[in-house]
Amino acid sequence: MGLVGWGLLLGCLGCGILLRARAQFPRVCMTLDGVLNKECCPPLGPEATNICGFLEGRGQCAEVQTDTRPWSGPYILRNQDDREQWPRKFFNRTCKCTGNFAGYNCGGCKFGWTGPDCNRKKPAILRRNIHSLTAQEREQFLGALDLAKKSIHPDYVITTQHWLGLLGPNGTQPQIANCSVYDFFVWLHYYSVRDTLLGPGRPYKAIDFSHQGPAFVTWHRYHLLWLERELQRLTGNESFALPYWNFATGKNECDVCTDELLGAARQDDPTLISRNSRFSTWEIVCDSLDDYNRRVTLCNGTYEGLLRRNKVGRNNEKLPTLKNVQDCLSLQKFDSPPFFQNSTFSFRNALEGFDKADGTLDSQVMNLHNLAHSFLNGTNALPHSAANDPVFVVLHSFTDAIFDEWLKRNNPSTDAWPQELAPIGHNRMYNMVPFFPPVTNEELFLTAEQLGYNYAVDLSEEEAPVWSTTLSVVIGILGAFVLLLGLLAFLQYRRLRKGYAPLMETGLSSKRYTEEA
């Protein structure tokens, strides 16, 4: 069997229903004792007493802090979902790292920092338009995605049951599974949007921790940063950066859906990916939401069929335009009450695509991010499965670029983000679900540069060409001249009807020239 064949085999095994102890929780913490004690504070290195790197001054084991402020929105239950007060249903003590140290055992650095002591600012990586990549850069990106699909995550596992069933039927076996790096990226997104499980066939659907609220921008930002760092590790290239797809073309075509990039449509079945693309063999995970709800279980990483896109019968739908992006960026308010999908004149809601790009609400309209997903259709059209499609990565990279442009233009204070009464998961200090160790929305409400990356993109107003400006001026002058001629003709007509009257009386008069004669 060749190298690729072994890679595919490992990829298939990587997300099976394997009850084995980075992704949702560190593998080292998902033991019977770890789950029962609700503590995830592993040692750093071989010294067992070096808990959270404490002996090196990197961190210590501490009580998890969660947001206790009230939320609003359609989720009205309490203590029914294991994502409430994340992650305390699973762990109430974790490593709290000091300074720029980060990670489940404080063994890494925060985004944007490097060095043994994490005290050296890392040169910012540059996210560029995917169409501007060289052939070598393009191959590195596509190859890294494929490698991530086939590589079991070395540190993290996923849970295959909700919190009440986490230890299995006999209460002694943690219900977990190994998963590939990319499939875990998919699983994170699924877990953030999945329904609350109340019983067989009784899902509570009014909940979403990564959409329909302020956390939409920060959640997806962290999601991409997580994947970018994993791809850097897989490729051994610390300067590796995710590209973006500028979907604001206003066209009726997906210009990244080619065999040179993320896969064209298959000729004999246009809902599938062309056999000339490496993505034609990608199988998807976490797609059978109704089945999970019926069985009161979670996505366990089993493959559920091939990746699909579906443009059939959608020939009149067009992608957003640059004007839509510019209108969205002109909105100065980050978000507005009720901080939900019906917020108006909210930059976040316009970017997410529930508002028109200018911030007005129209329930019949999809725009920007939502429109791009709808345009691709297929696997990409549903939140729980969308991240299976690699187009998701470059689509959200551009969405993040728009968010970053807004941050740079407006320089908002943290007070721009609601402390309370946003939907569950969307308050400023809520720990984003299901990232671990815990990270709040506020921690990602920063410019990209502060997090170690930048975008090579120009989202400013396009300057009109000289001939266009000149033509506009000439048309304006001609229009004013025609209007003046019409006004003079009207005045002459009235004067002839009333008879001659002097323009100015010789006597004093209180009548003003704006009044009727």
UniProtKB/Swiss-Prot annotation:
GO terms for molecular function: dopachrome isomerase activity; metal ion binding; oxidoreductase activity. Residues 492-517 are cytoplasmic. The keyword ATP-binding does not apply. InterPro entries: Di-copper_centre_dom_sf, Tyrosinase/Hemocyanin, Tyrosinase_Cu-bd. It is an enzyme of class 5 (isomerase). Glycosylated. Glycans are attached at residues 92, 170, 178, 237, 300, 342, 377. This is L-dopachrome tautomerase. The gene is Dct.
